[in-house]
Amino acid sequence: MVIVLWLVALGCAVAGQHLAHPAYSDATSLPGSQSDTGGALLARASSGATGYTGLVVVHAPTGGAGAATGATADTARALAALPDVSSVSELVTSTDGATAYWRLDFDVRPKTLGSGYPARLDRATAAVRQAGRQVAYGGGLDELTRPAGNDRAAELVGLSAALVVLLLAFGSVAAAVLPLASALVAVVIGLSVVGIVAASVDLATAAPTLAAMIGLGVGVDYGLFVTTRFRAHLVEGDDPDRAAGRAIASSGHAVLLAAATVSLALLGLYGAGLTFIGRLGLAATISVVVAAAAAVTLVPAGLGLVGRRIDRLAVRPPVAETSGAEDGWQRYSALVARRPALFLAGGLAVIAALSLPLGALRLGHIDAGADPLGSTSRTAYDLVADARGPGFGPGANGPFTVVVDLHGANQPADAIAAKLSAALGATPGVGAAGPLRASADGTVLTGTVTPASGPQSAATGTLFEQLVHHTLPDTLGGAHATGYLAGPTAGQLDFRDTISRRLPLIIGLVLVGSFTLLMLMFRSLLIPLKAVVLNLFTTGASYGVLVVVFQWGWGGGLLGVHEAVPIESYVPMMMFAIVFGLSMDYEIFLLSAIAEAWRGGSGNTEAVGSGLARTARVITSAAVIMTAVFLSFASSPTVVIKMLAVGLAVGVVIDATVVRMVLVPSTMVLLGSANWWFPRRPGRAGRARPVLPGPGVDVPPYTAGHGMPHQ
């Protein structure tokens, strides 16, 4: 019955997504920001002008790209006739005549124009193409023409890698396929639900990829934990139904708590007050919840059907699942217990070395200059950046729109315009400052400032800060006028600054929530405190590796990123929530085993050794699976997805090795019985009992036809 219900849910979810017609958008909104205020003022003063633009770039290596011919005139008219194009500029030509472009003003964000719009652009520019000139689309059109990620290929690679690891971990096809099948069903349902949600609210284009990546990784891991415990109970002599029931009560309970922790961290992104980021967290949360539900219902149902045939179709002799018998991990845990200070120092040294580059972290926006070579967006970017002359250079790919509110001004508009134009032109980092023109009603001045550097350059960010906080207020303050920088580049820099201010808030919310959850779960103060501190170490080390690979460019070419780029502004916030949540997964599984031993009467050191020995192999297998899944998504052409994939993979590796296998056991041995201290009400004595089912709990059998056992 459970399996049938899941198949019905699968069919309904897929059908619902097809009927919903989801649409994704990377539009960000920062109500109250200076760029948003300036954009709204521009729209009111310019009869609905949006500030959304695009470039149609023409190139002729031998010159004559901007020559006035019948082909250029026909193309200009065809571009002006396109839907949602409000105006087309005169052809701007470089000094050598090899490159020229039209700037198109749009009524809507180009991203919303639909996948068929590039074909319309091709038809509109057919005349200049036939004249032998190269045509590329850039500016705001890069959102429309940028190549989509090949998520299906990444998912297949991730599934294949997971299957190999599961076969090595379990030794049999049956045991390996069950967690994988459960994860696959969960991912399809989760993605379908995300699609249904996207039909009614704006979700980022990265949302489906993020949901698939997280859902596949945690789905396989959760299924692995339940299957491992099921096999352990079979070895102990339980019949299959009882083994399935006990697996749910122990590992299943931990799966639900781990999923709750991950979801808490992801939903905590809403605390930033940024809808764009909060909804990315929502998409990932949906996939985590579905994966956890499948692990505690669908996987046990499959285990109940397979029963003792779990080791059929063996590819090697199956490894016996034990409750901590003497093996290599038991000997390793004993070694850690003998020299905890040495292991702690070594682990901290590794974390410190990986975290050192964190001090150089620079947030920014990744522009079309990082798109794949040969793509139309990258070609347009490079042609404009490499050409010389007014309107060309790197900054022409991301100019600022200057908007001045003259309401209440005590000086004439032309005097204010002249003074501000001179100040803008004299500001270091400005490549060109266009004339400021008054609106029809004389209440607004507008103009364009072109930075000397590209949109993702640190110099452009510095110029933005100088203009917003010094040049504009210092120049306009005496005239009682107010200036703003609007346009996509200004909006992205405002977005970056907002995230920088709110990231500490998100970190605080997640830390407090996770500490509270673990405190209630383990009835301890030091255990949750240690957990949140060590998980912060994992996140910091992951950030450091991101800086080295992407910002410094060390090894970025292996991932298809051939230029150093800033860290996309929202990636650290997303990574913190995800890495912290996944780190808590392994923390909960390890501490659950340690707490069971402590609850059973073992001493602290003995409990730590027992828990480590019981969970080390399965945590290692789970980490390898998660790492393989994440790295498979590094093949995406989207740099942001590459960043998330690499950052999450590194975070999992660090957490499952240095943190979980070295720092956690060594600190717990050093802290001794203080690990388990928890304030009690007067008159109560004895050990604080973690809220975890132990191995001795009498759990009713699980049957595939009757769902979860009653607790």
Regions found by a protein language model. Name each.
Residues 1-22, 85, 108-363, 480, ...:
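Membrane-embedded transmembrane helical bundles of large multi-pass transporters/channels
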Residues 32-53, 61-139, 360-558, 588, ...:
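Structured non-transmembrane domains adjacent to transmembrane bundles in polytopic membrane proteins
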Residues 1-3, 25, 33, 47:
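Generic start-of-chain signal for non-secretory N-termini
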Residues 23-26, 367-368:
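Short hinge/gating elements
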